[in-house]
Amino acid sequence: MDVPGISRPVLVVLIVVAAVIFLYGAGTALSRVTEHTETQTRTFAAASTVVIATNSADVKIVASDRSDVRVTTKEQRSLWGGGHVRMRGNAGGLELRDRCHGLPVVEDPCHVRMLLEVPRSTSVRVDTATGDVRAENLEGGADLSSGTGDTHVIGVRGPVRVQAQTGDVDVEAPAPDISVQTATGDVAIVASHAQTIHAAAATGDIVLVVPNLTYAVDAQSDAGDDKVLVHVDDASPRKLRAHTNTGDVIVSSDAP
């Protein structure tokens, strides 16, 4: 077939491009129509410290009245593929291998979520490459590491340790000992029983909110404002340290 003014090689290229666009659109539409979530549940014997390693799953750990550990995974899939999960190990060292299967020319849903219900006294250690992490109401400690993703710690009573390469970190907990470090992301800590808080960010704002008491405070921003709005006494046993290279630092009390 010849089209006046368009050479045959150019026409072939245009036809191929049009076909690819059509296939992409049709495939993506079919993917959306057939999108669904598959759920798996497994139980493990309890461990004093539950250790989780994942590739790209969102991980949520909640304290419960269970005597064992229940793990629920939700895999988002479609006709063309999607998220797949394989668990290996036990509660003391559980490895979650999550990956995506699908067609490279189709926008396919691929997402994995993981929920762990653990005894209240449990401590947790989580290491994820990409994904959000959330820990709630543990009486033990939380040691959370994320390459890319936001981290949320709510109601944890034991020591809190968070390391994130890229992502915001929010902590609202009675934990007396809290340490947060992020390369890129904001840090917000509301500590109702603060004894020692260390917060550091290469790029991002840091906000600390603590009870209306006296603290030894080390707050510094290399390129931003730093405001200390609490009672300061360098001899206080309660230590607050907040450093950021680029961003603001605010240390305030929860007093009205």
Regions found by a protein language model. Give the residues of each.
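Terminal targeting segments of Actinobacterial cell-envelope proteins
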Residues: 1-9
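Hydrophobic membrane-insertion alpha-helices, especially the h-region
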Residues: 8-28
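Short linear S-[DN]-x-LW-Φ motif typified by the pepsin-like aspartic protease active-site region
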Residues: 11, 30-93, 113-117, 123, ...
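Short, T/G/N/S-enriched strand-turn elements that build extracellular solenoid repeat scaffolds
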Residues: 40-41, 58-63, 84-86, 113-117, ...
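Membrane-spanning beta-strands of outer-membrane beta-barrel proteins
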Residues: 44-45, 109, 235
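Beta-strand elements of well-folded, non-transmembrane domains
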Residues: 56, 75-77, 130, 148, ...
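Non-cytosolic head/periplasmic domains of membrane-anchored proteins
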Residues: 97-183
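Short, surface-exposed interaction patches in beta-rich subdomains
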Residues: 160, 168-256
